[in-house]
A protein has these predicted regions:
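Short, conserved glycine- and acidic-residue-centered signature motifs
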Residues: 21, 42-45, 148
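Short, low-complexity disordered leader/linker segments with a strong preference
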Residues: 1-27, 58
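Structural motif
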Residues: 66-92, 151-154, 200-214
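Extracytoplasmic "Venus flytrap"
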Residues: 29-50, 73-80, 102, 170-178
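Extracytoplasmic ligand/sensor domains, especially the bilobed periplasmic-binding protein
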Residues: 92-199
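Short, solvent-exposed loop/turn and secondary-structure capping segments
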Residues: 40-43, 83, 110-111, 134-135
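Immediate post-signal peptide segment of exported/extracytoplasmic ligand-binding proteins
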Residues: 20-30, 61-69, 159-165
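Signal peptide-proximal N-terminal region
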Residues: 47-70, 189-193
Length: 214
């Protein structure tokens, strides 16, 4: 969380001269999955960002003592259309920058459809899909979590170091899961480890016997 707080503070400092910052204060947005599969994680993530904003605001040193106001919005983690609508609400409300989103799919959608077209900086604390590296962000999108292009390689190295000879891979059927699975699969194969199957699965099912059977 310390890295997140520092990163948020830095990007606030760099963006407050944006023309959307009015004479009375600076509007910031936080968009995370307050509902959906990671709703138990996001309150602490949001609170840490709000702490950074508060420290900057209370310092009295931000653009001659400007104050920061923060608005939260729900990315849902899984519904890109809803996430885009929520992000549009933040921007139309005057947010000059956004902390978020969280899950890779909604993060990419917000970056490409809202943040970049409107010239609004966004910084994700958790989106790790390798595909986000290649989006045409024009310098407006950042993330503090490492790409799965690195994480998948590390997992493959650990698999090799433990002497594993074959693996079966199943992954959450979304941008995050597929990105990590693709990197891991290629990396373990490069280590000479056999991949017996690669299968997607949906979250929250009552029974995964069909996936296990493959």
């Amino acid at each position: 969380m310390r890295k997140l707080i520092i990163a948020v503070f830095l990007f606030v400092s760099s963006m407050v001269t944006n023309s959307n910052a009015d004479g009375h204060g600076i509007k910031m947005g936080i968009i995370l999955g307050f509902t959906g599969p990671i709703e138990s994680l996001t309150p602490a993530m949001a609170a840490s960002a709000e702490l950074a904003f508060k420290e900057a605001s209370d310092s009295g040193s931000l653009l001659g003592g400007k104050k920061i106001s923060v608005t939260r919005a729900d990315s849902t983690c899984v519904d890109s259309a809803a996430a885009v609508t929520a992000a549009e609400g933040l921007v139309s409300g005057g947010a000059v920058a956004i902390m978020g989103a969280d899950c890779s799919g909604v993060t990419g959608a917000i970056a490409e459809k809202v943040a970049v077209p409107n010239g609004v900086v966004m910084i994700s604390p958790s989106a790790t899909s390798p595909g986000l590296t290649d989006i045409n962000d024009r310098g407006y999108f950042f993330r503090t979590a490492p790409s799965d292009a690195r994480g998948g390689q590390i997992l493959a190295d650990i698999t090799k170091d433990r002497g594993v000879k074959s693996v079966a891979i199943t992954y959450t059927n979304n941008d995050y899961g597929k990105g990590l699975a693709d990197v891991y699969s290629a990396a373990v194969k490069a280590h000479g480890i056999k991949v017996t199957t690669v299968a997607a699965h949906e979250d929250g099912k009552a029974d995964y016997s069909s996936e296990v059977a493959t």
